[in-house]
Amino acid sequence: MSLVNCELMDHIVKILELRQVTHDVKQFRVEKPKGYFYIPGQATDVSVNRPDWKDEKRPFTFTGLSEDPYLQFTIKRYPERHGVTDLLHSLAPGDEIIVRDVWGAIEYKGPGCFIAGGAGITPFLAILRMLHQAHQAAGNTLYFSNKTTGDIIEHDELLLILGVSANFTLTRDPQPGYFHGRIDKTFLQDQLTDFRQPFYVCGTDEMVQQVSATLAGLGANPESLVIEK
């Protein structure tokens, strides 16, 4: 696929709006540079426009629609790192960040099974929102792992988009109506019957490696495993 985006360069943009999504996740809407284009599932490198932080770049996935008049990111804070996400969460509307060229991440290849852990849901948000807008979300299934219900990013919207095909599993705080435990071989064997469909996997490096290897061992075609690279 040929991807078209803006000229490769740094773009200084202002924060337009902030929304608290969970206790440690914020949604950022920022100015969209003229001619800036991305495909849902793609990402860019972001830094804060301050002298000591300009070169501290971190990758974040776009979570809005490509035709939106703004860029949107959904960013989890990691306070123990005392780094970029901490600083980003301290910013206010009017503050500036730097976005760079778009790079390919997760590409939608048709109806399948989305498997996410924590902040790994972010590339899927853009894809699922795109499908929902086009009335093409049917046929997709989501398995989303988090520690507690309070950690689930955009819980209600995912239910709206996917209905009963949105499945949530909790690893630390069992609750009625939710699966309990990690997404491991036993879980996948119990929940899945079609291993020929596309699988979209995003989460920690360890989770992606383990889930991808497990799916391949259960019969999934390696070419049908879509992971962030």
Segments the model singles out, each with a brief description of its role:
Residues 2-93, 146-148, 171:
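Ferredoxin-reductase
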